[in-house]
Every structure is written in C-alpha cells, then in structure tokens.
C-alpha cells in the first residue's frame, strides 16, 4: 500500500536544494497555486506523526523513493479548479482530476510519477499488457524495448506479429480488460475486416490532424480495440502513445512510452482526458460537410473586399466596354456589371412582358405581365442576395486578376534590367494559391546588385600558373585593402632575345634594361622554385582580391576559401613587376650576367600558348 502525506501548513514547506517555487506563484503566467507537498512512503504502517524535514535518513519509513535530490511532488491548483501534480525530477506536469471532490475519490491514481518510481526496480510492478498466446508472452516487452530506438526499429518487429491479440488490464479495477489487435490500418481489410470493416476507409479523416500534431511520418498506428474498433493506438516518434477516435476525431495521451503502458494498462485509455480537435480547413472531412462550399465562397468574398478596402492602389476606373460585354481597365479584362439592381429587375420585367405579348392578346398579356411582376416582387430579396454574393465574388476575382497582372509586369520589368528602378522597387507575389486562393499577395523586395561589391577582373580569377615570388608581411591585417590598379594587368608573351654564339663579343650583345629598383622595405620575400611540377604552391592573402576558382569548383568566386589556421597568409605580387634588391655594398665593380630560365614544358613554343612566361631573374 502506498500512502501520501500532504503538508498544507506554510511553515512546514521545505524545498530541496535547486528547487524554486516562484514559477508557481499566482502572479506568474501559469496561474497555478501550490496547495502542498506530497511525500510518498511504501511502508506497511500508516505514518501518523509529521516527519522532521531537517534530516533524512535511509531508514526513515516515510522517505520518498522518487529520488534523493528532489523527493517531492508538488500539488497545484488551476483557475478552473483542476488539480495538477508536478514531478520535480522529470520536470513534467500531470493532471490529477478536474475538481477537489473527484480527487478525494481517485487520489493519486492518475499520477504517472508513481508508476515510474525507482522503488519498482527492486519490487517491480506486474505487467498489465499481456498476450493471449503463451508462446508470445515476451512480445509486449520486446515491443516496448524496440520503441526506445525509434519508429524504424519498432516497425521492423511489429510487422512480423500482425494479427496478434493481447489484453490491457486496469490497475485498480481488476475485472476490466481491453483486447488489442496488432494490425496495420492500410491493410485493415485483411486482418480487421470482421471486427472493423470500415476502419481502413475512414481512418484517412484523421491523417491531416495527426500530420499537424506529430509531423508527417512521425506517427504509426499499431493496434485497435476489438470492442471499440474506432479507437486506435498510435506510437509517435518522440515516444508518447496516443489514442485516436476516428468517429469524433478526438485525441488523448495514454502513456509517455510503451514501458509505462505496460504498467498503466487501460487506466488512461478508459478515463483519460479527450481533446476533440477540429480538422484543418480544406481536409476531406470538412469539404464533405453541407454548406462548406458556401462558407468558403463567402470567406473568399469577404477577404477580397477587405483586401480591396486596404489596398494601397487607387480604384481603377473602366475606360471602355468591349463588344463582348467586358470592361477593359489598363489591359486587365473584367466582367461588366449592371449599375443598379432596379435596372436589372426592370430589364427582366420588360423581357417577360414582351414574351407574353408575343404569346397572346394585349389584355391577357397585361394581366400576365402583372402576375409576373408580382412574382418578381416576391423573389426580389432572394435575387438581391444572390446578386450581392455574385458581386462580392466578382470583385474578389477582379482584385486577384489585377494583382497577378501587376506582379507579372513587375517581374518582366525586373528581368529586362530597367535602370530607372531602384534596388527595392520591383515586387513579386509570395505564397502559393491552393484551395484558399483568397489569400492576398505579399509584396517582397527583389534584391539587386550591390554597387559596393567588388567584382574581380577575369585575369584575377584565372591567373598565371607560375607566380615568381610571394612576399610575406609581418602584419598583413594592418594593411588597408586597395582597389585593383593598372599594375595587375596580365603580362604578355614577349619573344626571347637571341642567344649569342661563342664568336660574338660581349660588347655586341644588347643588354636588357634593368628594372626599376624599389625602395628597401621591411617585407620578407620567399622564393618558390619548382622544377618537377608546373604549378607551384599558391596561397592567397586575406585582404587581396579573391582567390582563383577552377571551373570545376562549386565555390563562388565572391567567397574566400577556407584556410588552415596554422598556415600564414601570403599576399601575392603581380607578375608584371618582378621584385629586385639593391646591390650589396662592395668595393669590387659590379658585373652582370644573365641566367636563362628553364621552361616548365618540354616544347619551347608551348610556354607562350595561354600562359605568361616568367621573366628572368637578374642579380646585380
């Protein structure tokens, strides 16, 4: 027997460390008033004296067996009189009853924290989910364990035991037992035809509701009640087990998972809190109701009139009436409407009188004409109502036609690249138009090209494969970013000077002009000499123009590549201006000698085809 001690004296409130009762204050948003604390004990004798809250020992008979850090269950009361129980360990709120009088009868029967207590590890509760077949007595345990791994693992085991029958017992009313049949609702005609012949056909009414509640593909109906074939048990992706009544489309939770369902049995299945929810608008059930089309038509008309009233554009006046009776307003053809209802009624009356005049004499025609006029007077309110609804529908259709036409023109102007439009001038319609096509279009700004965005020239996207040298700055982040100048133009292929023979004197050979010597700087220069491969290593600078992008690379040229934090960024120097150094101080006269560069390709003419020839290095 389980006893509870309810402390309602404010002086005896003792909260464990880490527990804050402020969220339960009546001034909070939840509006839950704490009534007291519940201490659970599993002893054979009833606890009569209050326990000292200052010290707890393991041998204390009234020691709570929930957990050592938070041994309390807080009982709360809502505004409507419903009583709730907060499990501090799990952080969950359970509903106990809808009134205090009902709580005095049921007690903590519906408190699921009792059935999850760690005490049952030593003294386990009996399983209330059993199979009729003795050979499948292990099936509920295996299904509960497989559900911990998700719906895929549960489905792999569940589909092998379709058609198995089991029972759910009540924890208090032992004579109450509910039979379950494991089956698939999509194949309900085979397994459950004798019990529920129409379940497979009518279960689709709950699909929109379950998709909205659990997500598409996040639920699986695995069993139904043989005594009530319209009630199905559904396992969700997160673990909670739901019950769905396909007749009134109501949903309620019966357990947190299948492990708790084995201990609760049919407790919450028979006495749970049902939540009748209305299916989403536009579903099959709502569309089949009488008057649904009329309600939808009125809703579309009212939405169209509200959109027209709040529209920023002024009313469009008809310019002309075409031969087919349509009004042309700025390129949008709209149906012509009569100016007033009196003209419409008078027109019908004149047409009927002319028909009667053709049928018989003048006197009888006048009498019939009066009778028809009297009939028209009787049906005039009905015709006026239909005419007003037709006008509202037409106005909604006209408004949508105008919006679509304006959006189409804006998109065409945007595609043509009109320079007069600003960056956010064009608009486009957002949102699909399904069944509820009365939703107003939402104008969105179409982003244009940013003039502040620097677009690199083509020769920087595909530079020469062999840069001669790469300087490394001590502090590359301090140097400001400069726009590309004319110094970064691609080098051209220049013919190589003729090689002098051994008989030609040195004075007759034309010496190349020495490049300008830049002033000495603090930058270090690192040379990359590669004789084996034709493409040396290359690392771009973080503040230089973007790195080259190969045609096969999916990376955008405007996004800098990801570099390893261990490598140091090395800015690139244009290949058109080779770096040189001032001559070293020496007393000997300077003598120049030319070093010919070895081409990377075997063919002498292949170096000038699509590639820039690296200039020869001169040493002073």
Swiss-Prot record:
Pro residues composition-biased segments: 446-470, 481-500, 542-551
Disordered: annotated span: 278-620
Family listed: Belongs to the herpesviridae US22 family.
Bias type Low complexity, positions: 278-290, 301-319, 501-512, 522-541, 597-607
Composition-biased stretches (Basic and acidic residues): 336-411
Gene name as annotated: DR2L
Native organism: Human herpesvirus 6A (strain Uganda-1102)
Name assigned to this protein: Uncharacterized protein DR2
Highest taxon above the source species: Viruses
